[in-house]
A protein has these predicted regions:
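Short juxtamembrane and helix-loop transition motifs at transmembrane-helix boundaries
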Residues: 52-59, 79-89, 140
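N-terminal signal-anchor transmembrane alpha helix
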Residues: 4-42
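Interfacial loop-to-transmembrane junctions
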Residues: 103-127
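Core segments of transmembrane alpha-helices
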Residues: 64-79
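Short membrane-interface loop/juxtamembrane segments of multi-pass integral membrane proteins
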Residues: 43-63
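Alpha-helical transmembrane segments
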Residues: 13-20, 73, 126-133
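Structural signature of hydrophobic alpha-helical transmembrane segments
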Residues: 87-98
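Juxtamembrane boundary at the C-terminal end of a transmembrane helix
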Residues: 131-144
Length: 144
């Protein structure tokens, strides 16, 4: 396995963020045009969020979520690559994160079953914490 193998799940997460961003704008623009909202009505911060139904606000909320735990994931991937620690365990854990994070986004942006979304988020986040804890143990367990 080459060190750059870790960038496949990295860029899969970037692509997921792009897809949610596009979907969010499709939902927002459709809502704004169907309601014939004016620029003046949208000028006050938070107005769109207050008047938007879940089908519009959920993709926006999910996009915000993609700049929380995934940022830690990106940092860990870069750390693993720079320190040449990428191995099968890390790559598999990274793919676990991507799969559960993608499912979480799909649920959040569509039917939004909260308990399902919670478990998908939990499993994705546990994969990131596993990567972080394992990397920290290896880092601090070495005698330099």
């Amino acid at each position: 396995m080459t060190q750059d193998t870790i960038f496949s799940p990295f860029f899969a997460t970037v692509f997921l963020t792009f897809l949610v961003w596009v979907y969010m704008y499709i939902r927002r623009i459709s809502f704004i045009t169907s309601r014939k909202l004016t620029q003046k009505e949208l000028a006050v911060p938070g107005t769109l969020a207050q008047i938007s139904p879940p089908s519009v606000s959920n993709p926006s909320d999910n996009l915000k979520n993609l700049f929380e735990i995934p940022v830690l994931f990106y940092a860990l991937v870069l750390y693993l690559f720079i320190t040449k620690q990428v191995d099968t365990v890390y790559v598999n854990a990274a793919w676990v994160f991507v799969v559960f994070r993608t499912l979480h986004s799909a649920v959040h942006c569509t039917f939004n079953l909260i308990i399902l979304r919670f478990y998908l988020y939990l499993f994705a986040t546990l994969a990131v914490w596993f990567i972080a804890i394992r990397a920290a143990l290896i880092h601090f367990g070495t005698n330099d």
